């Protein structure tokens, strides 16, 4: 192998490794951010009374009656 082909091989490996690292970090950030975003939305929804609901668990410790949350 010539010096140019070795350098080219190393650069190709570095680019693939960097891309893999970026994708891995993005996946980890997404998996952490999604539950936090859901908790934030749920906490905001819990502060509002009279929201539509289907079950008691939809009402954040309230009671679902006639498709609306009662507190």
From Swiss-Prot:
Principal cellular location given in the protein's record: secreted
Keywords for the protein's UniProt record, in alphabetical order: Disulfide bond, Ion channel impairing toxin, Knottin, Neurotoxin, Secreted, Signal, Toxin
Gene Ontology MF terms: ion channel regulator activity; toxin activity
Recorded superkingdom: Eukaryota
Recorded GO CC terms: extracellular region
Tissue: Expressed by the venom gland.
Disulphide bridges: 46-60, 53-64, 59-69
Residues cleaved off as propeptide: 34-39
Signal peptide (from-to): 1-33
Subcellular compartments: Secreted
Domain observations: The presence of a 'disulfide through disulfide knot' structurally defines this protein as a knottin.
Function comment: Probable insect neurotoxin with ion channel impairing activity. Does not show activity on 45 human receptors from 9 families (5-hydroxytryptamine, adrenergic, dopamine, muscarinic, histamine, neurotransmitter, opioid, sigma, and gaba(A) receptors). In vivo, when mixed with U3-SYTX-Sth1a does not cause paralytic or lethal activity when injected into crickets. It is noteworthy that crickets are evolutionarily distant from prey species.
Protein name: U3-scytotoxin-Sth1h
Species of provenance: Scytodes thoracica
């Amino acid at each position: 192998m010539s010096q140019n082909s070795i350098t080219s091989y190393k650069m190709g490996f570095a680019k693939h490794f960097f891309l893999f690292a970026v994708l891995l970090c993005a996946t980890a950030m997404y998996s952490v951010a999604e539950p936090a975003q859901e908790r934030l939305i749920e906490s905001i929804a819990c502060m509002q009374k009279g929201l539509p609901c289907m079950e008691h668990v939809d009402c954040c410790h309230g009671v679902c009656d006639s498709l609306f949350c009662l507190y």
